[in-house]
């Protein structure tokens, strides 16, 4: 139902946020920002 849709959206948002944070962190470490 609605709850599983909300859960999926939240999971995807968390995944995207983690990806963004990871790429920001790695570019800072590599000084390529």
UniProtKB/Swiss-Prot annotation:
Keyword Hydrolase (UniProt): no
Chief location: secreted
Disulfide bond residue pairs: 27-33
Tissues showing expression: Expressed by the skin glands.
GO cellular component: extracellular region
GO biological process assignments: defense response to bacterium
Keyword terms: Amphibian defense peptide, Antibiotic, Antimicrobial, Disulfide bond, Secreted
Pfam families: Antimicrobial_2
Compartments in which it is found: Secreted
Oligomeric form and interacting partners: Monomer.
Family: Belongs to the frog skin active peptide (FSAP) family. Brevinin subfamily.
Job of this protein: Has a non-hemolytic activity. Has a broad spectrum of activity against both Gram-positive and Gram-negative bacteria, fungi and protozoa.
Name of the protein in question: Gaegurin-2
Natural source organism: Glandirana rugosa
């Amino acid at each position: 139902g609605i709850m599983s849709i909300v859960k999926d959206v939240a999971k995807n948002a968390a995944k995207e946020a983690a990806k963004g944070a990871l790429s920001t962190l790695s570019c800072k470490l590599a000084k390529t920002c």
